Amino acid sequence: MPIKGPKARIKLSGLNPRELDRICSQIKEIANKTGVELSGPVPLPTRRMVVPVRKAPDGEGSETWDHWEMRVHKRLIDISADERALRQIMRIQVPRDVNIEIVLES
């Protein structure tokens, strides 16, 4: 359901999907308490980065490789731009590995 009027688009990204879901539930709780419209959280595609590295440090011997992987999970939430709700959202304790981007749109 699209939100009418000014809205805030909140983009969450991080390495741990449980932490993202926990923060999303806190944002949903704040939206329910303040009575503002909420759309989401929408899970965006997970970005998977793989780095292949040779095991042998000198280049000699058989070619054996290690594959290191990092997955970046993303969520998107639209909320109507209410000053009281946004102040409470900005006071949420966020872990270090979770990034939050808030963009106000009209």
UniProtKB/Swiss-Prot annotation:
A Gene Ontology molecular function term for this protein is: structural constituent of ribosome
* Highest taxon in the source lineage: Archaea
Q: Which UniProt keywords apply?
A: Ribonucleoprotein, Ribosomal protein
NCBIfam families given in the database record: uS10_euk_arch
GO biological process terms, semicolon-separated: translation
- Do you know which Gene3D superfamilies this protein is assigned to? Ribosomal protein S10 domain (3.30.70.600)
The UniProt similarity line reads: Belongs to the universal ribosomal protein uS10 family.
How this chain assembles, per its entry, is:
Part of the 30S ribosomal subunit.
Functional summary from the UniProt entry: Involved in the binding of tRNA to the ribosomes.
Cellular component per GO?
small ribosomal subunit
**What's the name of the protein?**
Small ribosomal subunit protein uS10
What is the name of the gene encoding this protein?
rps10
The organism's taxonomy opens as: Archaea, Methanobacteriati, Methanobacteriota, Archaeoglobi, Archaeoglobales
What residue stretch is flagged as signal peptide? Answer: none
From the record, give the cysteines joined by S-S bonds.
Answer: none
Query: Entry's PANTHER family?
Result: 30S RIBOSOMAL PROTEIN S10 FAMILY MEMBER (PTHR11700)
* Species, as recorded: Archaeoglobus fulgidus (strain ATCC 49558 / DSM 4304 / JCM 9628 / NBRC 100126 / VC-16)
